[in-house]
Amino acid sequence: MQVLVRDNNVDQALRALKKKMQREGIFREMKMRDYYEKPSQKRAREKAEAVRRVRKLARKRAQREGLVAR
């Protein structure tokens, strides 16, 4: 991953790097790799995440169509 440093402004470059890493999911990946996760636990976690995503999407659709109050 690469970030340009303009006018020796390291703080701005660090912010840009953190934003890029956040978007790419690097922090989440590092957190997940802290400890070994058994394949069965990984499958269960991924399935639960998928269910959560589907429910969230359905909730957003319903809200957009005016079926659910905000």
Curated annotation (Swiss-Prot):
GO terms for cellular component: ribonucleoprotein complex; ribosome. The keyword Magnesium does not apply. GO terms for biological process: translation. InterPro entries: Ribosomal_bS21 (IPR001911), Ribosomal_bS21_CS (IPR018278), Ribosomal_bS21_sf (IPR038380). The keyword Ribosomal protein applies. It comes from the Bacteria. Keywords: Ribonucleoprotein, Ribosomal protein. Gene3D superfamilies: Ribosomal protein S8. GO terms for molecular function: structural constituent of ribosome. Belongs to the bacterial ribosomal protein bS21 family. This is Small ribosomal subunit protein bS21B. It comes from Rhizobium etli (strain ATCC 51251 / DSM 11541 / JCM 21823 / NBRC 15573 / CFN 42). The gene is rpsU2.
